[in-house]
Amino acid sequence: MQQNQKIRIRLKAFDYRLIDQSAAEIVETAKRTGAIVKGPVPLPTRIQRFDVLRSPHVNKTSRDQFEIRTHQRLMDIVDPTDKTVDALMKLDLPAGVDVEIKLQ
């Protein structure tokens, strides 16, 4: 690969344990192939809250509150080798983790 190239990986998940486990797998794989890893950096957790009326007819003041928490991690792999890219492509991550990869 070219000099001064880096791979930016952004992970998103609803479960923080899954995202931490996936980040550890990615870091271990990249370090094993000789790349320099910066991160994982925890990004702010996005919290979506929903208020729903409990009653179908009256009692407007009685509501249920639900929330969805989206956890995010960011990591950079500096000067990746071809071995690093191949190892990351073969990596099997859990289904609940969204992986976004950018080459810079």
From Swiss-Prot:
InterPro entries: Ribosomal_uS10, Ribosomal_uS10_CS, Ribosomal_uS10_dom, Ribosomal_uS10_dom_sf
Keyword terms of this UniProt record: Ribonucleoprotein, Ribosomal protein
Any Gene Ontology biological process: translation
Entry GO CC: ribonucleoprotein complex; ribosome
GO terms, molecular function: structural constituent of ribosome; tRNA binding
Pfam families: Ribosomal_S10
Top-level taxonomic group: Bacteria
Subunit-level organization: Part of the 30S ribosomal subunit.
Reported function: Involved in the binding of tRNA to the ribosomes.
Membership in a protein family: Belongs to the universal ribosomal protein uS10 family.
Protein name listed in UniProt: Small ribosomal subunit protein uS10
Native species: Ralstonia nicotianae (strain ATCC BAA-1114 / GMI1000)
Encoding gene, per UniProt annotation: rpsJ
